[in-house]
Structure formats: C-alpha cells, structure tokens
Design a protein with these regions (language model features):
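Long, well-ordered mid-to-C-terminal structural blocks that present hydrophobic/aromatic surfaces
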Residues: 1-13
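Ferredoxin-type iron-sulfur electron-transfer modules in oxidoreductases and energy-metabolism complexes
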Residues: 12-108
Length: 108
C-alpha cells in the first residue's frame, strides 16, 4: 500500500522506483514477492538515513515492524562501510556513493 513511503520524511525521490513502470522493476501487487521486494528496496534506500521516527510502523496497516529492518540496515551500513548518517550535510547517501575500496566479499 506504500503507506510507509507516504509518511516517511526521508522518502523524497522525484520518481520512486515502485512508481516506475517502464521497465517495471518492482512487482507492485499485494503478494509475498511484491511485498518482500518493496520492503527490501526501501530498506536499502533508507540504509543509514533512517532517523527512527517510527512513522512507517505507525502508518503500516499490516503492523510490519519496519523499524527493526531499518535499524538493522543502519547497523550494517556502519559496520560494513563505516557510514553513519547525519554526520555531514555534504555526505552522499550510502547507495549514492561508490568507493573503490568498499568491501565486495558479500557479492556472490
């Protein structure tokens, strides 16, 4: 339903990937596959940026504990990439920044 997207202060992309239809990257149907894809993509986009306001959980009609996923992604961002949001206003987002020295051992 994307209620979390509508209420999140950090969802501000001009065109969200779930709204893109050519090509359709994310299945927008209310299925396990579509829900999983949406929540994972959103977690990646917010990794290291979530401010912990928990509005996503408040807005979720399915009571999905989204803050757990967001906190985990923030921890991974810090541990794996030494990235912490809010420390520098000029710092690019985690997924908006490429560093040739980033770890790659998790890539299959």
């Amino acid at each position: 339903c994307y209620a979390c997207k509508q209420v999140c202060p950090l969802c501000y992309c001009e065109q969200c990937i779930v709204d893109k239809s050519m090509p359709r990257w994310i299945d927008s149907s209310a299925t396990v596959k579509g829900n999983f894809a949406w929540n994972m993509i959103r977690a990646f986009h917010l990794s290291g940026r979530c401010i912990g306001c928990n509005e996503c959980e408040r807005a979720c009609p399915a009571d999905i504990p989204l803050s757990l996923l967001n906190r985990k992604m923030g921890t991974v961002a810090m541990n794996e990439f030494n990235y912490r949001h809010g420390t520098d206003v000029n710092q690019p987002t985690l997924i908006g920044n490429y560093n040739v020295n980033d770890k790659e051992d998790f890539i299959l």
